[in-house]
Design a protein with these regions (language model features):
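N-terminal glycine-rich "phosphate-gripper" loop used for MgATP/nucleotide binding
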Residues: 60-64, 71-74
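ATP/nucleoside-binding phosphotransfer catalytic cores, i.e., glycine-rich phosphate-binding loops
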Residues: 130, 138, 143, 154-157, ...
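Short glycine/serine/threonine-rich phosphate/pyrophosphate-binding segments
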Residues: 17-18, 66-70, 175-180
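Short glycine-rich anion-binding loops that position phosphate/pyrophosphate groups of nucleotides
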Residues: 63-66, 89, 172-174
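ATP/NTP phosphate-donor binding region
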Residues: 1-57, 61, 97-113, 123-130
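Gly/Ser/Thr-rich active-site loops/lids in small-molecule metabolic enzymes
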Residues: 160-163, 167-204
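Proline-centered loop/turn at the N-terminus of a beta-strand
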Residues: 78-80
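Catalytic core of DAGKc-family lipid kinases
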Residues: 89-164
């Protein structure tokens, strides 16, 4: 792989990031890596402060929330990212504080895996489109209030629902809220939309996986006020007759993984995925 000669560091604005930051700077200095910027994730106009292709790598210090926000803000800058976890689960972050000094020199020397992943574009009626990395959740926002809505692929009706809402996820997001709702895990590079109705008044509202080459449209039928939430951070109200359009975003993003990275190992260790309830080695 390409040698890393320069890096930008983006860190959490709220967590204790200093130890990880110091170790990243120390590793970069030892490898003679040019550090272009060190910025908090909430830096104003961060996509303009960090120039397009300005660095070979962005190191992101934080949890999954910091990682998702950084990806969304910098997706058009075309710089691969590597996450360093100082949060809880850290499914998108491969390193932890203890592994920085050992693994970063390997990455800087070109020993890493590069993985390209698709993202989502979400538009409500004629509003400006939003970028989604994990998922968009369409829900009533009110306990015991159900929504009547229809789901389309382009103009073709897929299904009608009376339920609490629906999750539309990327493959990356399938290991998050979508998985918690009973959806399957999907390999994160797959070009798909994963659709999961929430608490539907139907015995056959199963998850649906569709290619992301065609847009998904959700149309709200009843007068109950509803909301959409994108990646757990963008929250917008929608009303009767509103249409939510989910499409493949024109920009993808790339993650750098350390040598030996295994997605299924991450699923097993971080999600306890596929783990038996009893010891099968006995």
């Amino acid at each position: 792989m390409k040698l890393i000669k320069s890096t930008t560091i983006v860190h959490s604005a709220s967590r204790n990031f200093k130890e990880a930051l110091d170790l990243c700077i120390e590793s970069a200095d030892k490898a003679d890596i040019d550090i272009k910027n060190v910025l908090p994730v909430n830096e104003k106009d961060i996509d303009k402060v960090i120039g397009k292709k300005e660095s070979d790598l962005i190191l992101v210090i934080g949890g999954d929330g910091t990682m998702i926000r950084t990806i969304a803000n910098l997706i058009d800058n075309e710089i691969p990212l590597l996450g360093i976890n100082i949060g809880r689960l850290g499914f998108l972050t491969d390193l932890n504080v203890d592994s920085i000094s050992k693994v970063l020199p390997e990455v800087f020397s070109g020993n890493y895996q590069l993985e390209k992943r698709p993202s989502l574009s979400i538009q409500v009626d004629d509003s400006e489109s939003l970028i989604g990395i994990n998922e968009v959740v369409f829900h009533s926002g009110t306990v015991a209030k159900m929504l009547n809505f229809s789901i389309f692929q382009e103009e073709k009706l897929i299904s009608k629902h009376k339920s609490d809402g629906v999750i539309v996820s990327s493959a990356t997001g399938s290991s998050g809220y979508f998985f918690s709702g009973g959806g399957p895990i999907i390999y994160p590079t797959e070009e798909i939309f994963a659709i999961l109705p929430m608490f539907s008044q139907s015995s056959s509202s199963n998850p649906l996986i569709l290619p992301n080459q065609k847009k998904i449209k959700i149309k709200l039928k009843n007068s109950v006020k509803a909301s959409i939430v994108v990646d757990g951070r963008e929250d917008f109200e929608v009303y009767q007759g509103s249409e939510i359009i989910i499409s493949k975003n024109k920009s993808s993003y790339s993650l750098i993984h350390p040598p030996g990275y295994d997605y299924f190992e991450a699923c097993r260790t971080k999600l306890s995925w596929g783990q038996p309830l009893i010891n099968l080695d006995d």
